[in-house]
Amino acid sequence: MANRNLEKLASIDAHLRLLVPGKVSEDDKLIEYDALLLDKFLDILQDLHGEDLKETVQECYELSAEYEGKRDPKKLEELGSVLTSLDPGDSIVIAKAFSHMLNLANLAEEVQIAYRRRIKLKKGDFADEAHATTESDMEETLKKLVYKLNKSPEEVFDALKNQTVDLVLTAHPTQSVRRSLLQKHGRIRNCLAQLYAKDITPDDKQELDEALHREIQAAFRTDEIRRTQPTPQDEMRAGMSYFHETIWKGVPKFLRRVDTALKNIGINERVPYNAPLIQFSSWMGGDRDGNPRVTPEVTRDVCLLARMMAANMYFSQIEDLMFEMSMWRCTDELRVRAEELFRTARRDVKHYIEFWKQVPPTEPYRVILGDVRDKLYNTRERARHLLAHDISDIPEEAVYTNVEQFLEPLELCYRSLCACGDRVIADGSLLDFLRQVSTFGLSLVKLDIRQESDRHTDVLDAITQHLEIGSYREWSEEKRQEWLLAELSGKRPLFGSDLPKTEEIKDVLDTFNVLAELPSDCFGAYIISMATSPSDVLAVELLQRECHVKQPLRVVPLFEKLADLEAAPAAMARLFSIDWYKNRINGKQEVMIGYSDSGKDAGRFSAAWQLYKAQEELKNVAKEFGVKLVMFHGRGGTVGRGGGPTHLAILSQPPDTIQGSLRVTVQGEVIEQSFGEEHLCFRTLQRFCAATLEHGMNPPISPRPEWRELMDQMAVVATEQYRSIVFKEPRFVEYFRLATPELEYGRMNIGSRPSKRKPSGGIESLRAIPWIFAWTQTRFHLPVWLGFGAAFKQAIQKDSKNLQMLQEMYKTWPFFRVTIDLVEMVFAKGDPGIAALNDKLLVSEDLWPFGESLRANYEETKDYLLKIAGHKDLLEGDPYLKQRLKLRDSYITTLNVCQAYTLKRTRDPNYHVTLRPHISKEYAEPSKPADELIHLNPTSEYAPGLEDTLILTMKGIAAGMQNTG
């Protein structure tokens, strides 16, 4: 198969070169990388499980490839009969093999992207394949602003050092790959990149070959399935591991590159170390919306754990800095401090490895940094004690309690070096360290708290009932506001210890008590989901005051559903009209807009347009009241939940809605894609910072009035069609549950939170992630495209000139272009033939016409999209992506078919299959089948092996689509 596979891959490559000769360069290594990994893997498979199993994998691959060529449904049935005849152990091995091959294809692709980028930069070209604007590189962006758009270098520098990008890592349950495997994947990537380095010796090559073999085999031999559900603390540790592995060192490295880019446009200053260019926040252990497992104790643990990790990372670096700071020339200010510290230093020196004796005053910088090291040690140990025992005997004065205390001695060293003519030394590791302290502080990340507005209403209702002044829940909005403002303006406490509390009320109040107990720099924003009115915001302000939160968190309303987005500007105007609130916010307000629930509620088309309009209107309201507005974008990883390339998403936002301040969620599997490797981390930071700068200094065009009018009309049609099918069609939920693996999603143990807000109920109560996940698995992607076709059809039928208008919008308006391109990309990943197979096997016959009409709608929508984009074929403007998707099609199809038939076997007790004798030989005992794999899941309610096979197909398809939910 390896040779045949290489031929097939090469033919895809040749076909692409013919299509667009200028676009696919001859130095493209993707085919080579992919074939090498596949070769290695197939050899391993044969060694471990025998020739017969390897041949079955090849047979499945070839049937898939034949299907991909002609889309002949008979080939899927042939493939199905091969897969259903396998015994349970073989079935697991084959599903695992295809899932593994898709992960290897992803790794080949990542190494190729990094390789191509290096080649481009060496040539001095723009870094991206098609055109510069799709990849925001810092240096390119600065040069473009200065040389093409005639901005002055000083103006650009000024904008840059005042901008902030805050990346908020969330534990959304979409990372379907286990951490054990992610680490092995990282090592495979490194081996592959080094194997193709120019100056590699034969011995190096042999050793790397062995290492690659070892890591591929180790990954294949690791159980891909999480056998228990992760806790919020597990999720937080997984999220924080990226800081340890890439982000910690990535930030100073990125800021150095910004310094270099500034030098190249004539600015001879560095970005100040305290410029808030990049910030990190987290929802892991703070997001309790619909997740009962995030308790106040979890929030406290997560904050202390992050503080301990931060102190530990600083501590592990401080000795290197002490080695570097061996200079003796210093300012009088620093010398006096060093002598004072030397005199008063306690003699009970810690058991340090380096500088374990007292440092002499002739090395003043080391004396100062030695004191910093002692305090960091104590800071780490105190956090550890509090985490383990709730109490610590290390006094507060021996630790750093705020970041200013930590920065002060470091700034003293920096000033002294500069004053003594050693700026070049100051701008080395010390500057990097200062930048890390400014970025990560003592808490590593700022934890956001998220809670549903109803939970606050419950607490206030309990309080008003206890005070015997009525039921807060039943009061009108006016009465609620009046009472809240009266209490906020007064001084008296609202309730005492005698307040009767249910578990839920105690949970909410205890969360506020944790906010009061821990240092304020642990926390970021308090986000209220399902916020609709000013009283929702005032309620949180009052509860913070009542629970004695010394530095109250900024309160951020989250608008998600279509109706809430429409009402958001009016709600914010009412809030800004309240004098007490206007004084409280000091001219700054953050508003969060949710992409996933708005898409689930109204479909992607209407959600995208409403999000665009809501931002424009919110910006105008804020301007009217003299408030600086920060938009917080709650984007998922998939297009159905607002995902897509970062730089394009930023550059297509309405003009003046970012203005140098951007907050955005980085969710689930996107964290790995953004920060899994050093070069990915670097690229992510570049993209966000460069695109934010460009959006502010070179805003996209505003849509013309006639475009707006057309969009408004189309949005009505799109919403109507989407809702008429998803919410009004009486048997839609039944069809959805039969045609997709939605009901089986929970078995993957991806995240700590339940997949439903309420245990029973229809689409409304289903979370957006499993909703998208289920459709992604069947490659039908219904939530992404449903409504687009009807909207375009109606617009063009109403007036044929609208087609030209839509084509013009596509060419000149970034928002519209990005929206269409993302849906086109999803169509390129889709295959209605797979959805048809699922219908045939899993859906009751009387619902088949419903599936057929949806597939007809799919084809019609695709045709309209191509017409508007002016393309003959999907992705003709992006040959690289086309090539990458083609490479993985045959693997995914095998898993799709395996999933459909496995679902049939788990759901239909009357479906009988004839199993052939087992073909897999276990390496240690060739006579023994691979049935020990079945014993990894002893509690399955299905026939042996079926549940694991099913979960492996879900994980493999998620890896292949590169989108989970």
Swiss-Prot record:
Expressed in roots and stems and at low levels in leaves. Preferentially expressed in the phloem and in root tips. It holds the Pfam family PEPcase. The active site is at H172, K600, R641. Coiled coil: none annotated. It is found in: Cytoplasm. Its EC number is 4.1.1.31. Its main location: cytoplasm. Gene3D superfamilies: Phosphoenolpyruvate/pyruvate domain. The keyword Phosphoprotein applies. GO terms for molecular function: phosphoenolpyruvate carboxylase activity. Its cofactor is Mg(2+). L-aspartate binds at R641, Q673, K829, R888, N963. The modification Phosphoserine is found at S11. Keywords: Carbon dioxide fixation, Cytoplasm, Lyase, Magnesium, Phosphoprotein. It catalyses: oxaloacetate + phosphate = phosphoenolpyruvate + hydrogencarbonate. Activated by the allosteric regulator glucose-6-phosphate. Inhibited by malate and aspartate. Up regulated by light-reversible phosphorylation. D-glucose 6-phosphate binds at W283, R450, D597, R635, T665, R753, R767, A768, I769. HAMAP family: PEPcase_type1. Through the carboxylation of phosphoenolpyruvate (PEP) it forms oxaloacetate, a four-carbon dicarboxylic acid source for the tricarboxylic acid cycle. May be involved in phloem loading with sucrose and in anions and cations uptake and amino acid biosynthesis in roots. Belongs to the PEPCase type 1 family. Homotetramer. This is Phosphoenolpyruvate carboxylase 1. It comes from Flaveria trinervia. The lineage of its organism: Eukaryota, Viridiplantae, Streptophyta, Embryophyta, Tracheophyta.
